[in-house]
A protein has these predicted regions:
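C-terminus-biased signal that marks the final domain/tail of proteins
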Residues: 1-298
Length: 298
């Protein structure tokens, strides 16, 4: 969508000569947010390439297609995994050079591993310090999962089911690479109080965001160690949501038939609230454990 004078303004301001094919991105920006003369960034290239590797999309190209047809059917959990991406194990991995040698206490075997202190969400001052010690040891990359994220969604729509239960927003607060996703059905009529409060401008214990963020930030301090528990809990709630989804759909339909729409929607509302409560409790427990593990210092 654009205003009717989109071409005229581009000509008047010298952004487009009127002879070449008009490209909005080139006329009104000409570069991505990293200043590169292209229409896309690392994140777009990574996701499109992951979905359609057969296209062999070239990062050195000036532009990419706005969308691609995936090589195979994409599941909801596939999309969730993409939104957690930090390019680990690829040439874009920010932690790949942050290695230490460790010695096994029992065998005496020495190995080189990524430092437990390394994490893919380092602030600029950390990057500057590390690159000051050894130039180029860390290259700043815009990950798909970023710590400044307020929330992210994976929207699942099934037209063969009633709208109230066929539409599910898999919702996550804070960093998508560290937080769980909760199923928010289109038919719910209310949210838990903590989900109605914004915590982005100041710390609030009554805002759900900070119950996730507290554990997430503490985990990043020693990510190599803390991630084991956090990723296990992320998987737990992802698998729980997928496993229980058919049951919830059946229950909704049964209640709808026997008690009516209001009761059926109340069931969905309660289910979402219970799911949210379970994730908050688990992330609070993790944060407390991370504090204990940090009692001798970070």
């Amino acid at each position: 969508m654009a205003s009717e004078n989109v071409f005229d303004v581009a000509k008047k301001l010298g952004y487009w000569n009127g002879k070449e094919p008009f490209k909005f991105w080139k006329a009104y920006s000409g570069k991505n947010y990293s200043g590169q003369l292209k229409s896309f960034s690392t994140r777009e290239h990574f996701i499109l390439n992951a979905l359609a590797p057969s296209l062999k999309l070239d990062y050195e190209a000036e532009e990419l297609p706005i969308s691609v047809k995936p090589d195979k059917q994409v599941s909801v959990t596939d999309v969730m995994a993409l939104l957690r991406e930090t390019y680990e194990g690829t040439p874009l991995d920010m932690t790949q050079n942050l290695k230490v040698t460790v010695k096994d206490r029992k065998t005496g075997k020495v190995d080189t591993i990524i430092s437990p202190k390394a994490n893919p969400w380092m602030r600029g001052d950390e990057l500057n310090m590390l690159n000051g010690i050894k130039k180029g040891v860390v290259k700043s990359v815009r990950n798909i999962a970023v710590p400044q994220c307020a929330y992210s969604t994976v929207i699942q729509l099934r037209n063969w089911l009633p709208d109230a239960v066929g539409g599910v927003v898999w919702f996550s607060m804070d960093n998508p690479g560290q937080s769980p996703r909760v199923p928010v059905f289109c038919g719910i009529t209310d949210f838990p109080a903590m989900y109605k409060i914004c915590g982005n401008h100041r710390y609030r214990d009554d805002a759900a965001l900070w119950h996730y963020r507290r554990a997430n930030k503490l985990a990043a301090v020693r990510w190599g160690t803390a991630r084991k528990v956090m990723e296990k809990n992320i998987r737990h709630f992802e698998e729980k949501g997928q496993r229980e989804l058919p049951f919830v759909e059946a229950q909704y339909q049964s209640i709808l038939q026997s008690k009516g729409e209001e009761a059926a929607r109340a069931y969905l509302t309660d289910y979402t609230a219970d799911f949210i409560g379970a994730t908050i409790l688990r992330w609070d427990e993790m944060a407390n454990q991370y504090w204990i593990e940090s009692r001798f210092g970070f």
